[in-house]
């Protein structure tokens, strides 16, 4: 009997999803991306070799896996071809194993130009986007004016649609943002030069997934970003432009929600966030700096330093509600080695004195919120690369168990290093 498993970030992204997807891909036939775009950087380290995948599913490094990009993903043709080229130069036959929905919206140069222009205009109030055109591409999708991969099949119609939409964008870029317009002919020529390669990978993703399920195949859905960045349920407006929660699987791939068997929430042993927005447990002291240093907390795509803080069980409880999380995978446990004490935020004190155990929704509702911590003894022993749970320090085990208690969800997988072998699977999601 095949199982369908979702892997998603339960915090603000950068939790280490790529490694865990890669680890569990050994068990599956299909790996599916269902939301986001090339703003998601999944870093994999296999046999000491580092690979960063931004758009193509992490399963591409496994020769027997077919990778699918669902309709919920916005696709930059330029980024796709660049990533394909990087993988093909290593002997990976991407075109034989990558299939893409024709309903995927395209990210084109005018989306990137608009993204940069808006962030510059906002100044210090900027959202902190990756500047890759993700948001504007999703806007076009909702406004029903966007170009999609399926439009590449009719080159004449594509050229006409592109001309109309570029007039719309260039008017804003020139007259409102006072920046250079995007060149129509260059944009058209660049896309047409690679159109046949992209259309050659188009497939009916929904039917492929339905057939795989009926045939008893294991399927893995690979989420990008994190729950607290969800466009609807995250810390709005400091969010991404897609549904990063488990509901995005159904809408972003066409896979029926009743067919999902297990949702694995990836959590760091602490918390990080990139860009603006509320972050209740953020540390501004030497402890925060030490976590950032030990955890090498810099964005895989942007290179920006990540904000660091203690584990926030309040935000995680919201993630559990939103995703019906079956179990956690805790990553970067080894980063907390050596601290005299470790803390877990178990509640928030609101500005009016109310104590709450679930995170607010809108960013404005986080203003003035204070974390209420439980402090536990730390551990001096080294947990890096430990692969036997019985060899973990007792205080480390106590920390893990306390997180399970305050969240009500078991930690089924533990990660103690960047390589996929540096992992303890306590309960296999495909056997749960």
Curated annotation (Swiss-Prot):
It is found in: Cytoplasm. Its cofactor is Mg(2+). IMP binds at residues 14-17, 39-42, 130, 144, 225, 240, 304. Its EC number is 6.3.4.4. Pathway: Purine metabolism; AMP biosynthesis via de novo pathway; AMP from IMP: step 1/2. GO terms for biological process: 'de novo' AMP biosynthetic process; IMP metabolic process. Keywords: Cytoplasm, GTP-binding, Ligase, Magnesium, Metal-binding, Nucleotide-binding, Purine biosynthesis. Binds 1 Mg(2+) ion per subunit. The active site is at 14 (proton acceptor), 42 (proton donor). Mg(2+) binds at residues 14, 41. The keyword Cytoplasm applies. It catalyses: IMP + L-aspartate + GTP = N(6)-(1,2-dicarboxyethyl)-AMP + GDP + phosphate + 2 H(+). Its main location: cytoplasm. GTP binds at residues 13-19, 41-43, 306, 332-334, 415-417. One of its GO terms (molecular function) is adenylosuccinate synthase activity. Substrate binds at residues 300-306. It comes from the Bacteria. GO terms for cellular component: cytoplasm. Belongs to the adenylosuccinate synthetase family. Plays an important role in the de novo pathway of purine nucleotide biosynthesis. Catalyzes the first committed step in the biosynthesis of AMP from IMP. HAMAP family: Adenylosucc_synth. Homodimer. This is Adenylosuccinate synthetase. It comes from Haemophilus influenzae (strain PittGG).
């Amino acid at each position: 009997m095949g199982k369908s498993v979702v892997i998603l970030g339960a915090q603000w992204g950068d939790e280490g999803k790529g490694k865990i997807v890669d680890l569990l891909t050994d068990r599956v036939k299909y790996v599916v991306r269902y939301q986001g775009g090339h703003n998601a950087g999944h870093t994999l380290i296999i046999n000491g070799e580092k690979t960063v995948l931004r758009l193509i599913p992490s399963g591409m490094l496994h020769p027997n896996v077919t990778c699918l990009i669902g309709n919920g993903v916005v696709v930059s043709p330029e980024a796709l071809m660049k990533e394909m080229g990087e993988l093909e130069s290593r002997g990976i036959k991407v075109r034989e194993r990558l299939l893409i929905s024709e309903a995927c919206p395209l990210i084109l140069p005018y989306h990137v130009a608009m993204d940069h222009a808006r962030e510059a205009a906002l100044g210090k109030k900027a959202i902190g986007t990756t500047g890759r055109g993700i948001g504007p591409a999703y806007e076009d999708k909702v406004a029903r004016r966007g170009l999609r991969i399926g439009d590449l099949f009719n080159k004449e119609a594509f050229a006409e649609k592109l001309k109309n939409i570029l007039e719309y964008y260039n008017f804003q870029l020139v007259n409102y943002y006072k920046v250079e317009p995007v060149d129509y002919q260059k944009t058209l020529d660049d896309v047409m030069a690679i159109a046949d390669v992209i259309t050659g990978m188009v497939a009916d993703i929904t039917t492929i997934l339905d057939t795989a399920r009926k045939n008893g195949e294991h399927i893995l859905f690979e989420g990008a970003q994190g729950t607290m960045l969800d466009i609807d349920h995250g810390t709005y407006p400091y969010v991404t432009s897609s549904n990063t929660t488990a509901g995005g699987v159904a809408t972003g791939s066409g896979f029926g929600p009743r067919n999902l068997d297990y949702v694995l929430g990836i959590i760091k042993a602490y918390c990080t966030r990139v860009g603006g927005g509320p972050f209740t447990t953020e540390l501004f002291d030497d402890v925060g700096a030490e976590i950032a240093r030990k955890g090498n907390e810099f964005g895989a795509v942007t290179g920006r330093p990540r904000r660091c803080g203690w584990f926030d069980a309040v935000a995680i409880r919201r993630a559990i509600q939103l995703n019906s999380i079956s179990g956690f995978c805790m990553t970067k446990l080894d980063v907390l080695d050596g601290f005299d004490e470790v803390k877990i935020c178990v509640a928030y004190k609101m500005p009016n004195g109310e104590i709450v155990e679930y995170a607010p929704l809108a960013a404005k509702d986080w203003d003035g919120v204070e974390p209420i911590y439980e402090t536990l003894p730390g551990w001096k022993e080294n947990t890096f690369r430990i692969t036997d749970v019985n060899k973990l320090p007792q205080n480390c085990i106590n920390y893990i168990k306390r997180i399970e208690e305050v969240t009500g969800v078991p930690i089924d997988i533990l990660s103690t290093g960047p390589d996929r072998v540096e992992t303890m699977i306590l309960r296999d999601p495909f056997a749960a």
